Amino acid sequence: MARTKQSARKTTGGKAPRKQLSAKSARKGVSPASSAGAKKSRYRPGSVALKEIRRYQKSTDFLIRRLPFQRACRSVVKECSNATDIRFQGPALASIQEALEVYLVGLFEDAMLCAYHAKRVTVFPKDISLVLKLRSRHVKSISD
């Protein structure tokens, strides 16, 4: 069989027309949406969260994006000091971000322990406030 080039075909540019429901099925009250497609499959509760946990535990990237963090740093520094033009070196911002993320991850780990102690799996604001209170007491006892 000889090989030949195929020419481009014209398309109508739309979806194929839907089939009309027969009069019998229309009388039964079957909606076209329910009979047309199957129910969309969903993951079981918690499996997506576990997948995200595994992904973030594998990665070494920053959890907070760089530019929003940089803007937040600049706004905090502007509020604290009177200087109008403040510049940061890239490694300085990266080290501040690294330290902040380590602190926040530790805070949420301890808050999760508080939630488990209360026989819950959801972290509430009261868990975070408890962790902060316990940490401040620990710091005061060390400094005395």
From Swiss-Prot:
Q: In terms of one coarse class, where is the protein primarily found?
A: nucleus
Region spans: Disordered: 1-45
What the record says about family reads: Belongs to the histone H3 family.
List residues, modification N6,N6,N6-trimethyllysine. Answer: K5, K28, K39
Q: Which residues form a coiled coil?
A: none
What's a single GO CC term here?
A: nucleosome
List residues modified as N6-acetyllysine: K10, K15, K19, K24, K28, K39, K58
Q: How does it assemble?
A: The nucleosome is a histone octamer containing two molecules each of H2A, H2B, H3 and H4 assembled in one H3-H4 heterotetramer and two H2A-H2B heterodimers. The octamer wraps approximately 147 bp of DNA.
Listed InterPro entries? Histone-fold, Histone_H2A/H2B/H3, Histone_H3/CENP-A
What is the organism of origin for this protein? Encephalitozoon cuniculi (strain GB-M1)
Task: Indicate whether Nucleus appears among the record's keywords.
Answer: yes
Per UniProt, which keywords does this protein have? Acetylation, Chromosome, DNA-binding, Methylation, Nucleosome core, Nucleus
Q: What does this protein do?
A: Core component of nucleosome. Nucleosomes wrap and compact DNA into chromatin, limiting DNA accessibility to the cellular machineries which require DNA as a template. Histones thereby play a central role in transcription regulation, DNA repair, DNA replication and chromosomal stability. DNA accessibility is regulated via a complex set of post-translational modifications of histones, also called histone code, and nucleosome remodeling.
Q: Which residues carry this modification: N6,N6-dimethyllysine?
A: K5, K15, K28, K39
Lineage start? Eukaryota, Fungi, Fungi incertae sedis, Microsporidia, Unikaryonidae
Gene3D superfamilies attached here? Histone, subunit A
Q: Which CDD domains match?
A: HFD_H3
- Report the residues modified as N6-methyllysine: K5, K10, K19, K24, K28, K39
Q: Which GO terms describe its molecular function?
A: DNA binding; protein heterodimerization activity; structural constituent of chromatin
- Protein name as annotated: Histone H3.1
Modifications the protein undergoes after translation, according to the UniProt entry = Mono-, di- and trimethylated to form H3K4me1/2/3. H3K4me activates gene expression by regulating transcription elongation and plays a role in telomere length maintenance. H3K4me enrichment correlates with transcription levels, and occurs in a 5' to 3' gradient with H3K4me3 enrichment at the 5'-end of genes, shifting to H3K4me2 and then H3K4me1. H3K36me represses gene expression. Acetylation of histone H3 leads to transcriptional activation.
The places in or outside the cell where this protein is found are:
Nucleus; Chromosome
| Pfam families recorded | Histone (PF00125)
